[in-house]
Amino acid sequence: MENTVQPSTGQTTSPTQSDRQWAAGAHAGALALALLTSWAAGIAGAVAAFVVWMVVRDKSAFAAEHAREALNFNVSMFIYAAIAVMLVIFTLGIGIIVALPVWIVLGLMWLVCSLIATFKAYDGHMYRYPLTIRLFK
C-alpha cells in the first residue's frame, strides 16, 4: 500500500478504506456510466468522475486526486474521439480509414486503463493515465 504525506503535519498516512472505495468508485463509475451510455459519447464517463470529485474533494485528497485523474482521462478520450469524427467529416468520409483504427485503439486503451486505475485505487496506489490532458487541476 502506498503511503501519502500530509502537507500540514508532514506525517505519512495510508488512505482509509473509505478513501480507497471512493477513489476506485470514481474510475469504476466513469467506466460503468460510459459503457451504459455508449463509450463513443465519452463524456458520460466524465460526469461520474466529476460527481465523485465534487463529493470528496474537501474530504479526501487521495480520492479527490483519483476522481480528478478519471475526469481528465475521460474528457481527454472524448476530445481524441471528437477529433477523429472531425477528420471523417472534413475529409468527406475518407478519414474513416484513419479514424476507425484510432477509435478501436482509444476504446481498448480506455477500457484497460480504467480497469487498471480502479484496481490500483482500491489497493491504495496512485495511477496516472497515459495520454491525458490535465484540464482540471
Residue ranges of model-derived segments:
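Low-complexity, intrinsically disordered extramembrane tails and loops of integral membrane proteins
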Residues: 1-21, 132-137
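Juxtamembrane transition segments at transmembrane-helix termini in multipass membrane proteins
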Residues: 2, 112-137
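Membrane-helix interfacial "entry" motifs
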Residues: 19, 61-65, 96
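Hydrophobic alpha-helical transmembrane segments in multi-pass membrane proteins
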Residues: 23-47, 72-114
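Hydrophobic aliphatic residues
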Residues: 32, 54-55
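Membrane-embedded alpha-helical segments of multi-pass transporters/permeases
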Residues: 53-54, 115
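Amphipathic, cytosolic membrane-interfacial segments at TM-TM junctions
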Residues: 55-80, 119-129
